[in-house]
C-alpha cells in the first residue's frame, strides 16, 4: 500500500507475474486545512438529494471502503425538514466475507423542532478495509442523501434495472454486534449522506 494506492499482483498461470496500481483512493486526498465533509459511500461528485427515514425500530445499513489509514474526528448529518428526533449513527467493521460485524463507534445527534447540519464528536481510526454505516432515528425524518447514481451497487436482483443500495433491519437501538440475519434489501433508493470530518 502506497498512500492509498493498492498494488495488485496476478499470476497468469504460465509463470508470468503482473503488478498494477489501483488508483482508487478512499477517502480522496484533500489540501491542508480542508475541514469539509467526506461522505462515506459517495462514489462520484454530484448534487445530493433527500431521503425519507422511517423512525422507530428501523436501522439502515450500507457499506463503504477505506483504502488508506483514516482518522475520523466528527460525524454529521443534515435534516432538510424540521423535526424532533435523536439520530444514532454507528460504524461497524466487517467479517472476512464482508458482512457487517462489530460496532466500533457510535454517536447520537439530537434535534428539537429544527433542521440543518448538526455534528457530534466521533474519534475513530480506521485501517484499510470494508466497513458498514448504520443509522436509525427515533422519529421519521428527511435527510440529505446520496442519489442512486452515486451510490455503491451492492447487488442487482435478477439482473434487473435497480441495484441494492442499502439494507434494513428491525432494532430498538444500534446493536453491539450486527445481526446475522433479518436484512431486507432496498433497491434503487438514495442512501443517507453521513459526513465525516477527518483528522
Question: Where are the regions that the model predicts?
Answer:
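Short, surface-exposed beta-strand/loop patches at domain edges
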Residues: 136-199
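Short glycine/threonine/proline-enriched tight-turn/helix- or strand-capping micro-motif at secondary-structure
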Residues: 47-63
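Extracellular repetitive beta-rich solenoid segments
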Residues: 1-24, 30-33, 54-59, 68, ...
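A short tyrosine-centered beta-strand micro-motif
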Residues: 129-131
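Glycan-recognition and processing domains
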Residues: 26-48
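Exposed aromatic-hydrophobic patches
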Residues: 116-124
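A short beta-strand element within beta-rich, extracytoplasmic domains
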Residues: 70-81, 133
Amino acid at each position: 500500500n502506497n498512500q492509498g494506492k493498492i498494488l495488485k499482483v496476478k499470476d497468469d498461470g504460465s509463470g508470468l507475474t503482473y503488478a498494477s496500481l489501483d488508483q482508487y483512493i478512499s477517502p480522496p486526498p484533500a489540501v491542508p486545512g480542508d475541514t469539509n465533509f467526506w461522505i462515506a459511500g459517495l462514489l462520484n461528485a454530484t448534487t445530493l438529494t433527500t431521503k425519507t427515514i422511517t423512525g422507530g425500530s428501523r436501522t439502515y445499513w450500507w457499506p463503504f471502503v477505506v483504502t488508506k489509514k483514516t482518522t475520523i474526528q466528527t460525524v454529521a448529518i443534515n435534516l432538510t425538514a424540521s423535526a424532533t428526533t435523536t439520530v444514532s449513527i454507528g460504524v461497524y467493521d466487517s467479517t472476512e466475507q464482508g458482512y457487517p460485524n462489530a460496532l466500533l463507534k457510535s454517536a447520537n445527534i439530537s434535534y428539537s423542532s429544527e433542521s440543518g447540519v448538526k455534528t457530534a464528536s466521533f474519534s475513530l481510526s480506521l485501517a484499510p478495509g470494508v466497513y458498514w454505516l448504520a443509522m436509525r432515528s427515533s422519529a421519521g425524518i428527511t435527510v440529505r442523501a446520496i442519489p442512486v447514481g452515486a451510490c455503491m451497487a451492492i447487488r442487482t436482483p435478477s439482473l434487473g434495472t435497480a441495484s441494492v443500495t442499502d439494507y434494513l433491519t428491525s432494532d430498538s437501538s444500534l446493536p453491539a454486534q450486527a445481526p446475522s440475519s433479518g436484512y431486507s434489501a432496498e433497491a434503487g433508493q438514495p442512501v443517507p449522506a453521513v459526513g465525516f470530518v477527518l483528522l
